[in-house]
Regions:
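N-terminal amphipathic/basic-hydrophobic helices that include classical n-h-c signal peptides
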Residues: 1-17
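N-terminal functional module of multi-domain proteins
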Residues: 61-143, 147
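Alpha/beta enzyme core
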Residues: 168-283, 291-295, 299-308
Length: 355
């Protein structure tokens, strides 16, 4: 007689595939007091929660980034031949399944509630992104172990990751660039808008603005593509181009460093017109669904960064959750392209949107 296995044992070992609803429910429970996972992630509930998940001050920079992006509308078109849109693209010499990269985020305890450690989070995002056919950026903070955890995750991914470093003294940045190079990272850079970051002050870590000469030194210190994240003006985009920067990211740091800034989507088009033929331009800011990616591409970005939803993925479903978040965004982008007549992510025009 075959041994009868109880239903309880079967349920214990059975693998249930997660979905977005389950991931978000898990994350909401595990991030109580830090993130409410609001139906509309608009920065209202979490305003002023820095450290935490919100925007600094009254939270207006977060709110503006959300509101301005939502005010951009897409033009629906259904009489066309774009039946099977191409989502694949190449960034930093890597073929990606769609033009989205995981943003650099650290501080799981004081920003996210601590359900996952910084080490676990780094592994989740780097490997989860790889599972989804794209790449993740790892971040830097006052605790040196955070950067170390990110570097170790990049090593596990055979170098498929990007190291973004706080705007420390140049010698400290270069030291970390060399560590990233040894790990096989595909690109390195700084988030220049971290120059006044509150969380760095908590650790007594000196950060500050960079001159064009500083940028030139950093660019020339490595053979890897060099990125500057946190550009919000045409003037600074031009300075980055003059310094030989490979890629800029139009970003207001999720509204977490300076209140009352412009939204990234407000300045993106002008920046692309000014430097888009010289350097790569990516953007971030309130990307919550696939149609948001479409909007940024229509404004001229070559790709976007995904921030807060990736946190939900890690906290709510770990590595698999990150993969599911990214694949959901990819599927939504695919559908949005069909319904707007866009056949390739590399040639989405401004005619796709109305500002």
């Amino acid at each position: 007689m075959p041994k009868v296995v109880s239903a309880k044992i079967l349920l214990k070992f059975r693998r249930f595939d997660m979905d977005i609803k389950e991931i978000k429910e898990n994350a909401r429970e595990r991030m109580k007091g830090f993130c409410n996972l609001c139906r509309e992630c608009d920065g209202v509930w979490c305003a002023g929660k820095v450290p935490g998940m919100g925007g600094t001050g009254t939270g207006n920079s977060f709110k503006i980034a959300h509101d301005k992006l939502k005010n951009i509308k897409v033009v629906m078109r259904t009489i066309h031949s774009a039946k099977n849109p191409i989502l694949e693209t190449s960034l930093f010499g890597e073929k990606l399944s769609f033009p989205a990269i995981v943003a650099p985020i650290t501080g799981t305890v004081f920003n996210m509630g601590g359900y996952v450690s910084d080490e676990e989070y780094s592994n989740d995002v780097v490997l989860g992104a790889l599972d989804a056919g794209t790449i993740a950026m790892i971040g830097d903070t006052g605790d040196p172990k955070c950067f170390e955890h990110g570097i170790n995750a990049i090593k596990k991914a055979n170098g498929k990751g990007i190291a973004i470093i706080k705007p420390r003294e140049n010698d400290e940045i270069i030291k970390r660039i060399k560590i990233a190079e040894e790990a096989g990272a595909i690109a390195v850079g700084i988030d220049s808008d971290g120059a006044g970051l509150v969380t760095m002050k908590l650790f007594g870590q000196p950060v500050g603005p960079k001159s064009v000469e500083d940028l030139k030194i950093l660019v020339n210190s490595t053979k890897l593509p060099f990125i500057v994240k946190g550009i919000l003006s045409v003037e600074e985009a031009i300075l980055c181009a003059e310094a030989g920067v490979h890629t800029i990211i139009v970003s207001n740091h999720g509204g977490r460093v300076l209140n009352e800034t412009l939204a990234p989507c407000e300045v993106l088009e002008d920046i692309v017109k000014a430097v888009g033929d010289k350097i790569n331009v990516l953007a971030d800011g309130s990307v919550r669904e696939g149609v948001d990616i479409l909007k940024y591409l229509a404004l001229g970005a070559k790709g976007v960064l995904i921030g807060r939803p990736i946190i939900w993925g890690s906290v709510g479903g770990r590595q698999e959750g990150v993969k599911i978040i990214l694949e959901t965004l990819k599927n939504q982008l695919y559908q949005s392209m069909i319904l707007t007549g866009c056949d390739n992510v590399n040639n989405i025009s401004s005619k796709t949107i109305i500002k």
